[in-house]
């Protein structure tokens, strides 16, 4: 994902795209800051919040022998660098809260 800011130049954006192509990136997209924040808020940050919530809402040490791949995936996601995630959540707070509210609206329907 290439995100343009007010400091970005066309040449700089093209250079970043060419680097992605040289590295054989499968998808190279240019998004606005708002599009990026919305997508990351939903796909990454909301997912992380849900994973952490599931890992902390119930003592699950006695359930370890019964877990499947999806639960193990959630524990892996929940354990990722909490200091980094805290900073990312604060930087994208408004969008993350919006995504949480949308999720909860659908959940309770």
Placement of each model-derived feature along the sequence:
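Interdomain hinge/lid region at the active-site interface
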Residues: 62-109
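Internal alpha-helical scaffold of NAD(P)-dependent oxidoreductase catalytic cores
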Residues: 1-77
């Amino acid at each position: 994902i290439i995100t343009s800011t007010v400091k970005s130049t066309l040449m700089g954006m093209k250079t970043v795209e060419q680097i992605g192509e040289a590295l054989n990136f499968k998808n190279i997209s240019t998004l606005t800051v708002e599009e990026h924040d919305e997508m990351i808020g939903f796909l990454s940050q909301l997912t992380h919040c849900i994973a952490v919530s599931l890992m902390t809402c119930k003592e699950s040490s006695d359930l370890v022998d019964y877990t499947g791949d999806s639960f193990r995936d959630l524990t892996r996601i929940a354990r990722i660098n909490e200091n980094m995630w805290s900073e990312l959540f604060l930087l994208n707070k408004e969008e993350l809260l919006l995504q949480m509210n949308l999720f909860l609206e659908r959940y309770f329907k």
